[in-house]
Amino acid sequence: MKLFIAATVLTTISFAHPALSESIAHTRQLLATKQCQSCDLSGAGLVLANLSGANLTGANLSGANLSRANLSGADLTGANLVGASLFGANLTGAKLGGAQIAGADFRDAYLYNVSFGDADVNVAHLQGAIGIPIAAGKAEDFYRWGMLQGQKGDSQG
């Protein structure tokens, strides 16, 4: 029985290791070159990273922590940002067309001149975000977001 458990653990580790090392290699590549198209960066810790102008088209950033990262001018077209934390991140001028942003946390993020394209902002957390483009939603969306802010006592006046 002990042999079976040990074999199971070793098999699990050996299968998980290549994916982990690939993710680490992609993270290093991104930080060194700011080029990481279609990379697997899922779950990556990129807090406070300077990724201005980075090319992350088609990258998998699901569950990644990009809190307070500088992504100004970054190309995130078609990226998977499902469940990613971009709390307080600077996304000024970033391209997010076709990105999957369900459950992404954009609270307190800077979104000036962001191009969301056809990304559905109604499935992301935008409370406290600054500079949300008018094209990001309908009047009803902005009203709802404002009401949520008011209920939380976050209104300025």
Model-identified regions with their sequence ranges:
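Positively charged n-region of N-terminal signal peptides that target proteins for export
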Residues: 1-5
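Tandem repeat scaffolds
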Residues: 17-157
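Bacterial N-terminal signal peptides
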Residues: 6-14
